[in-house]
Swiss-Prot record:
It comes from the Bacteria. Keywords: Ribonucleoprotein, Ribosomal protein, RNA-binding, rRNA-binding, tRNA-binding. This is Small ribosomal subunit protein uS7. The gene is rpsG. It holds the Pfam family Ribosomal_S7. GO terms for cellular component: small ribosomal subunit. The keyword tRNA-binding applies. One of the primary rRNA binding proteins, it binds directly to 16S rRNA where it nucleates assembly of the head domain of the 30S subunit. Is located at the subunit interface close to the decoding center, probably blocks exit of the E-site tRNA. Belongs to the universal ribosomal protein uS7 family.
Length: 155
């Protein structure tokens, strides 16, 4: 019998919430199934962050992700021949997934050498509430605010 609801995946290796988030992020970094490379990039980036700030790198990572996570987004709805951008709230899992995606996209587009350096720089920017990923979040929120009048089209 089919389930009506998707059961969230249980990660065997994740012991705490911190590790769960970092394992998920490593999986987002991974390309072509090369998990060991992704883990090395993440570990190196965290070491660089810890060197520069002198704080726990996982705390910095969590705060940076928290600064990037959007709470609303706009979805296109076609009503009576015209398309409206309708602001909708986002589930927690999607907020985190979008934050990961934006963080990686803007990390990869930076000019530093090596992905671990790029990721560390973008994490520090996100921690200090600046950088491309935070700007993307603000743009998304502005778009939702501008289209607030169409919120009644949500269903």
């Amino acid at each position: 019998m089919a389930r009506k609801k998707i059961v969230s995946g249980h990660l065997k290796n994740a012991i705490s919430k911190d590790e769960h988030i970092s394992v998920k992020f490593v999986n987002c970094i991974m390309r072509d199934g090369k998990k060991s490379v992704a883990e090395k990039v993440f570990k190196d980036a965290m070491e660089l962050v810890e060197e520069k700030l002198g704080e726990s790198s996982l705390k910095v990572f969590e705060k940076a992700i928290g600064n990037i996570r959007p709470s609303v987004e706009v979805k296109s709805r076609r009503v009576g021949g015209s398309t409206y951008q309708v602001p909708t709230e986002i589930k927690s899992s999607r907020q985190t997934a979008l934050a990961f995606r934006w963080l990686l996209r803007f990390s990869r587009s930076r000019s530093e050498k090596g992905l671990s350096n790029k990721l560390a720089a973008e994490l520090l920017d996100a921690y200090n509430e600046r950088g491309g990923a935070v700007k993307k979040k603000e743009d998304t929120h502005k778009m939702a605010e501008a289209n607030k009048a169409f919120a009644h089209f949500r269903w």
